[in-house]
């Protein structure tokens, strides 16, 4: 059976229209999705003390990361942090630690602390989104993350110590 040119054109147009309709229905709706800001959750307080004088250097409201999931997430996907806020990572054992800045948008000072609450090393001004390993110089049980540049500004050094308490509702 031979189709004339007009019929062929009509069939081609109909098939093209059906394909266009099919592919446009597969397209996702253009909705405005809002990014949910991860907010700081105060779960305790931490104080930093100078090694030589035992004088108070700074006080922080802390969010605590002590489950595997919390330690893995850390401050990832956060876009801001106040100077008096910090995250304290609590590990079940003392050993060499290493952190990196994957999916972390805030420059941080990463402070490694032993089981006697003494600072054993500091990685200053870790660059956002950088996946380079930032190891401790000595075994650590705790890791404190504060806003980048604060350890230099406040004179926080190896040998200084911390004291912290969890909030009662923890």
Could you describe each region identified by the protein language model?
Residues 2-14:
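Bacterial N-terminal signal peptides that target proteins for export
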Residues 21-25:
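C-terminal motif of bacterial Sec signal peptides marking the signal peptidase cleavage site
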Residues 27-170:
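Compact, glycine-rich, soluble single-domain proteins
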